Amino acid sequence: MPAVNLGMPKVPEVLAPRRKTRQISVGKVKVGGNAQVSVQSMTTTQTTNINATLQQIAELTATGCDIVRVAVPHQDDADVLHILAKKSQIPIIADIHFQPRYVFTAIDAGVGAVRVNPGNIRKFDDQVGAIAKAAKAAGTSIRIGVNAGSLHPSLLQKYGKATPEALVESAVWEASLFEEHDFHDFKISVKHNDPVIMVKAYRLLAERGDWPLHLGVTEAGPAFQGTIKSATAFGILLSEGIGDTIRVSLSAPPAEEVKVGLQILQSLNLRERKLEIVSCPSCGRAQVDVYSLAEQVTEGLKHVNVPLRVAVMGCVVNGPGEAREAELGVASGNGRGQIFVKGEVIKTVPESEIVQTLIEEANRLAAEMPAGSIGSPEILV
């Protein structure tokens, strides 16, 4: 039987075309328009601890983060932004609450963007004209960051709580103020900790204008819960073409947020797939240690920078057929594994040698592919 490539197609399919938006720049990163969906995170260090903050930014950059946000709760934090902006490998967004003067300090510091919270910055509406003028002169973009937890009291009184309509009304009002001052380089977020309310809010917002949208489920929770919430909400919106940049909020190290965000985008074919482990959940038919094989293969191939799909199959029900139709595969059973290359068995090895043999063959195939290519090889274990 001829081998069939089950890897990524040359032009990955998506569920819906991207929503058409204006494009802005956050430093060197384009957001909206035809730019890829970018992944953001936020540092957890004290911003004034320059070395620790830059170290965390470097770790985020290495993980694949495109844009990083830093907290600016005090004047001392605002005063070090110029150092961070100069030394960071990726654009910095200054996160501003309460004090409008920090916005101007951040713009002068050369950050990529400033996040403003219209719900809690003092007399924010009166400051929009000056902020727009300063940001436009510096080439700094703005994120209008509406959050259910800090919605303006007048909107809470009007709607009774942070409804999708309340979040959108706040965002659209502030957007109109910036546009009145001929400032259009902004994106918008309307975050809520309930994925259902969040999805409804973004759908409403997407109908109101062509602004780039930053997706986020605020206060999503610990790693497991937060991953589920974010994947659910982002999956719905991105599959509808809504969303231009994302941040997965987790009570976990920031690098984990980036890993989850990238995986969500890859799962929707909005980012090129790299290493992907497809493993069976194991059952009473399994004749090898599926869990161990999956973990060892993941570790052994983590350096690979071309699309590799690795499926860990633990029994003879699906293993041989799947392996024969893959570029590279292993059909496991009875303490050994048959190694397939392009549908042909090239060797049978003991179970103890399956992982090493697979990694060697995978590296050989990967070396034949240019970095960043889309397509085979697919690997099945």
Swiss-Prot record:
Catalytic reaction list: (2E)-4-hydroxy-3-methylbut-2-enyl diphosphate + oxidized [flavodoxin] + H2O + 2 H(+) = 2-C-methyl-D-erythritol 2,4-cyclic diphosphate + reduced [flavodoxin]
Name listed for the protein in its UniProt record: 4-hydroxy-3-methylbut-2-en-1-yl diphosphate synthase (flavodoxin)
InterPro entries named among the record's database cross-references: Dihydropteroate_synth-like_sf, IspG_bac, IspG_bac-typ, NO2/SO3_Rdtase_4Fe4S_sf
Keywords assigned: 4Fe-4S, Iron, Iron-sulfur, Isoprene biosynthesis, Metal-binding, Oxidoreductase
Record-stated family: Belongs to the IspG family.
Pfam families: GcpE
Pathway where this protein functions: Isoprenoid biosynthesis; isopentenyl diphosphate biosynthesis via DXP pathway; isopentenyl diphosphate from 1-deoxy-D-xylulose 5-phosphate: step 5/6
GO molecular function (one): 4-hydroxy-3-methylbut-2-enyl-diphosphate synthase activity (flavodoxin)
Organism of origin: Clavibacter sepedonicus (Clavibacter michiganensis subsp. sepedonicus)
Entry note: cofactor: Binds 1 [4Fe-4S] cluster.
Role according to the record: Converts 2C-methyl-D-erythritol 2,4-cyclodiphosphate (ME-2,4cPP) into 1-hydroxy-2-methyl-2-(E)-butenyl 4-diphosphate.
Domain of life: Bacteria
Cofactor: [4Fe-4S] cluster
